[in-house]
Every structure is written in structure tokens, then in C-alpha cells.
A protein has these predicted regions:
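Non-heme di-metal
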Residues: 16-394
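Single conserved hydrophobic/aromatic residue that forms the stacking wall/gate
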Residues: 1-14
Length: 394
């Protein structure tokens, strides 16, 4: 923010020249777009342009959990009894999950939060990133409890070409936006002499395009790329093997559904005109969006082939997983206004038994035995009426 000296006093200018950690200018955030509006000042959560982001923040906080709440004593002995092909499936998926959440443990805060111009969305993203860190800690907790030497997992992630190939496709859009945004920050484009110029307007438009691609890629990451590994974790749980790990992954899946909704809300608000530039960009980028969905689906299919190269599991095989990925992809495309492209009925979930692991509410467990994952911390019911408890007597 810019300052000028008047006598012995320092006065704050009535405009903001660049990014600042605390904007002292009056900003009417309910009239700003989600990104690239004026920098934020007071963190206030009482007046929202989009209340849905505040609800998502509250829900994420209500779902707070720690991996240490789930016992993995049985998992360690279970792992020793797994056949070699089962160990391959379990360990390979664990490595991939570590990579994905290493990206998401940094991405939203590095890429999106600095350019966010709504307090409710900024707060939502901060909690999102924090929960992704919980996920990364959870994978470490699993690895330390299941393997005698955690290094045999961690130290081989970056030497696995299949994981590196997928990492590149996941991180490219993030990196493109972050690097371009930093160049924009360090340029003169935001200064008065350049604002509104052809060069400045063209630069910001292309920067917004990169932001769109980054958010769209994260939408696909949260909505598709986790689900092959999730399904495998749940399959072990269905077989009463590695149940603690399956329960932790179920908690992670519940969180990832919240993060998926965040990206869907952002994309749909762009599509519906939150920012006129982003509405136009969404339309221009539809062919790219379809192609990116297709690439992700194909990569997940190849991953399923790799997982089951030495044999399948009871209740799960390569063909079922590939059908499941197509079914999930259709749902994700429809949710952001795209037409489903895969020939599979929406009601025909190829792996219906995964649903109760993902939704949490379908799981009935004794509290003393395991983490009750349908429990919400700090939940408040606000639609209670005078006669709500009229039928109760003490």
C-alpha cells in the first residue's frame, strides 16, 4: 500500500497501488469478483456475497479430526499377511496419495488465496489448505505404523516414473498460474499509467485464463484423481483388512468431497457471471476442459492397469475400476455445466459398496472401537421452533 508524509504525520492514500496484507481502503466486498478485486482489509464474517463459502468453512471445521484417533495396531499385522500383489496395490496407492496431498497441502494457499477478494472465500481456502495438511500427516501416520522402515515408501516416491508423470499433469497448471501471477505482481501493469491499457488488459485476461485452468485442474484432481486409490483402500476395508487405514482414507474422502464442492462453486459462479472475463474464458476453455477430463480419466485407467498387473482383489478388478472412473467423470462434468461424455448410466455405480465409505453416514461403528466419522464438532441447529419439543416430557 502507498503512503505519503504530511508534516510529521503519515497518511494512508485513498487508493491501493498494489497487493497488501491489510487494505485500509473501504472495500465493498459484496460487489467484488471472487478473484483480482481490491485487496482485503478487515477479516469479517458477517456479510457475504456468497454465503455458500461460509457454510463450507463451517462444515470443514465441524469435521475436524486427527489421524491418531484411529488405531492402526491391527493394520501392521494385517499388512504382513497380504499377498505380494495386495502389498503392491496398497503401497502404490499410498505413494500416489502422498504426492497428491503434498500438492494440495500447498497449492490453494500459494496460488489462489493471495488473489482472493472475498473474505468468506479466503477463509474457506485457509481451512481447505489446513485440512490437506491433516491428510498428509495421516499418510505419514499410516506409513510409520504399517512399515518397519518408512523410508521404503517415502524415498521411492520421486523415483517412481508413473507417479512423476501424473505429478507433472497435476502441477503444471498450478505452476503456470503461480509464475505468471508473480510476474504480474512485479510488473508495472497494476499502476495507474498502465491500468486500462491494451497491454495491461490483455495481460490480466490471460492471467485469468491461467487461473481458470488451475482451478479446473484442481477440480479434476479432487473429483477424479483420488478415487481409484480411495476405492482400493475401501476394498481392503470391505475384506476386513487394513481397516484402520481404510477408516482414515474414508475421513480424507469426506474432506475431499468438501474441497471438490469449493472448486465446483467457484467454476459455476464464473460460468454464471461472477466476473465477465471469467464467464467468457469459461466458454473459450470448454474444449480444453473436456480434454483435461479425458486425460485424467485415461491416466487413472492406466494406473488401474498398473495396480492390478499382478492380480486382482475380491470385489475389485481393473475393469470395474475403469468403469468407476468413467462414472465418476460423468458426475463431475455435469456438476460444472459440461455434458457427460462416457457411455455409462448415472444410476449404475459400478462400485456401489464404496458409497457408504465416502458418505460416512452409512457406517455404523461402536465409538469405543473406532473414530465416529459422521460426528460434527460444533454443529448447531438453527431452525428450532417453539413447538419442536412439545411432544417430549421429563
Amino acid at each position: 500500500i502507498g503512503y505519503r508524509l504530511v508534516g510529521s504525520e503519515m497518511c494512508i492514500r485513498d487508493r491501493v497501488d498494489s497487493m497488501t496484507v491489510f487494505n485500509t481502503e473501504e472495500v465493498e466486498t459484496t460487489k467484488q469478483p471472487m478473484f483480482f478485486g481490491k485487496p482485503l482489509g478487515i477479516q469479517r464474517y458477517d456479510n457475504y456475497k456468497y454465503p455458500v463459502f461460509e457454510r463450507l468453512t463451517t462444515q470443514q471445521l465441524g469435521y475436524f479430526w486427527r489421524p491418531e484417533e484411529v488405531s492402526l495396531q491391527k493394520d501392521r499385522s494385517d499388512y504382513q499377511t497380504l499377498r505380494p500383489e495386495q502389498k503392491h496395490i496398497f503401497t502404490s496407492n499410498l505413494k500416489y496419495q502422498v504426492m497428491l496431498d503434498s500438492v494440495q497441502g500447498r497449492g490453494p494457499g500459494m496460488a489462489f488465496a493471495p488473489y482472493c477478494s472475498l473474505p468468506e472465500l479466503e477463509g474457506c481456502m485457509k481451512v481447505w489448505e489446513f485440512m490437506e495438511m491433516i491428510h498428509s500427516r495421516s499418510y505419514t501416520y499410516i506409513i510409520k505404523n504399517v512399515y518397519s522402515d518408512p523410508a521404503e515408501v517415502f524415498d521411492t516416491i520421486l523415483s517412481d516414473n508413473r507417479i512423476l508423470e501424473r505429478a507433472q499433469s497435476v502441477t503444471q497448471a498450478y505452476d503456470d498460474f503461480i509464475n505468471s501471477a508473480h510476474e504480474y505482481d512485479q510488473s508495472n501493469m497494476w499502476k495507474d499509467g498502465w491500468r486500462g491499457s491494451y497491454v495491461s488488459e490483455t495481460t490480466i485476461y490471460e492471467l485469468k485464463r491461467k487461473l481458470f485452468r488451475a482451478v479446473a485442474n484442481v477440480n479434476i484432481l479432487e473429483g477424479i484423481r483420488f478415487y481409484v486409490s480411495f476405492a482400493c483402500s475401501f476394498a481392503f476395508g470391505e475384506l476386513k483388512l487394513m481397516e484402520g487405514s481404510a477408516k482414515i482414507v474414508s475421513l480424507i474422502a469426506r474432506d475431499e468431497n468438501q474441497h471438490l464442492v469449493i472448486t465446483q462453486q467457484i467454476l459455476n459462479k464464473w460460468r454464471n457471471g461472477d466476473d465477465p472475463d471469467m464467464k467468457k474464458i469459461f466458454k473459450e476453455e470448454e474444449p480444453w476442459f473436456y480434454k483435461t477430463f479425458e486425460n485424467a480419466v485415461n491416466q487413472e485407467k492406466l494406473w488401474s492397469e498398473y495396480l492390478f498387473k499382478n492380480g486382482s482383489m475380491i470385489g475389485l478388478n481393473e475393469k470395474l475400476l475403469q468403469q468407476y472412473v468413467e462414472w465418476i467423470a460423468n458426475k463431475r462434468m455435469k456438476a460444472v455445466g459440461l455434458k457427460p461424455v462416457y457411455d455409462i448410466a448415472q444410476r449404475a455405480n459400478p462400485l456401489p459398496w464404496t458409497q457408504h465409505w465416502i458418505s460416512s453416514k452409512g457406517l455404523q461403528v461402536a465409538p469405543q472401537e473406532t473414530e465416529v466419522e459422521s460426528y460434527v464438532v460444533g454443529g448447531i441447529k438453527q431452525d428450532v421452533k417453539k413447538d419442536t419439543f412439545s411432544g417430549f416430557k421429563l
